[in-house]
Amino acid sequence: MAIVKFENVSRIYTSGDHELRALDNVSFSLDEGKFVVILGPSGAGKSTLLNLLGGLDSPSEGTITVSGTDISKLTDNELADYRASTVGFVFQFYNLIPTLTVYENVRLVSEISGKALDAKEMIDRVGLLDHLNNFPSELSGGEQQRISIARALCKNPQILLCDEPTGALDSETGVMVLKLLFDMARNYGKTVVIVTHNQNIAKMADVVIRVKNGKIRSVEEQENPLSADEVEW
């Protein structure tokens, strides 16, 4: 069942007489519980696509439907509610609050989500229950990224959006993070969408969307995606 549907979506930026089509007439759909990779070079439109799906921006043309709701028609307040209730975000840089402990960083989302899950349970799920009272500066990069994933999951989102989640990590830690994200799709029914320029990560995906110059070049379904351990780094 499709949880996400883009129909003829464009995002156009203007400056004087100049017009930039960051996305140009994009259409695709995604089923619930899939591990999706959006692949393309820098400037292809990947992050614009992710921002639109995450409710951080609105399309200039077309419609974006998530769980039956056309989010392209939502007001600013309604988009804020959508971001709080439906999507979780994981970025390349972890955006943890340095003066809060691990537990406090994760628990923080319970203040904006009415259906938040237990913070300790999410921290345990990412394997860092022993670090509840540590501050971000006391963690490795991989540990900080896992905490950012725990924080996103604590919101109990339908969709987990990840922008280059392994970009700042070494290969061993990157594999660990990808295993965790893959598990969220396979065993917890989350729709996980990863934006990356790393073609190796695409080998793990149920669906690969290739983007170039603001256009969808292909949407490929992979029947037998590789595990993170099988991908050559």
Language model features: what each stretch is:
Residues 2-211:
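ABC family nucleotide-binding domain
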Residues 215-233:
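Conserved beta-strand-loop-alpha-helix hinge in the C-terminal portion
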